[in-house]
Amino acid sequence: MLARIKPILGATAVGTAIGHLGTTMLFYPAMDAVGSGSPFPPLIENDLVASFVYVLIAVLFLDWVVQKVGRPMFNAMVMAVSQILIVDVNYVMIGRRALEPALISVVIILLLFAGAAFTYEKLSD
């Protein structure tokens, strides 16, 4: 695992930057515009720290999958689409999220995972 620390940390940094900026600059304002705030208090109050923890967990899982089967970008997109189906598509269908914030979330998730996988791949060489 120590040999993979550079790609893991790099992917986490890129994913955190994309996720945090996308969430705070696009997703939260879209949720506020439709009057849909957070129904529960956050487990981690600081948005940047929360983004970092989420992305680190996702990248560690991605690293594990890549070590088993390879193909970082493909597996990152499988993870992204899975999250989109479980959260965004389902939440729109059951009325827990408006369409505009869900579409913004889809873009953020795809960019986050693509950026993390690209960085992981480049730093693994």
Label every model-predicted segment.
Residues 1-125:
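Juxtamembrane/disordered regions of integral membrane proteins
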